[in-house]
Amino acid sequence: MTDTPLSAAEF
């Protein structure tokens, strides 16, 4: 999960 909105929300 590095190109997903969920991952982006974590960072």
From Swiss-Prot:
Domain of life (superkingdom): Bacteria
Enzyme class: oxidoreductase
GO MF annotation: an example: pyrroloquinoline-quinone synthase activity
EC number: 1.3.3.11
Pathway(s) the chain acts in: Cofactor biosynthesis; pyrroloquinoline quinone biosynthesis
Annotated GO biological process: pyrroloquinoline quinone biosynthetic process
Disulfide bonds: none
Keyword Signal: no
Catalytic reaction list: 6-(2-amino-2-carboxyethyl)-7,8-dioxo-1,2,3,4,7,8-hexahydroquinoline-2,4-dicarboxylate + 3 O2 = pyrroloquinoline quinone + 2 H2O2 + 2 H2O + H(+)
Keywords tagged on the record: Oxidoreductase, PQQ biosynthesis
Similarity-based family: Belongs to the PqqC family.
Function: Ring cyclization and eight-electron oxidation of 3a-(2-amino-2-carboxyethyl)-4,5-dioxo-4,5,6,7,8,9-hexahydroquinoline-7,9-dicarboxylic-acid to PQQ.
UniProt name for this protein: Pyrroloquinoline-quinone synthase
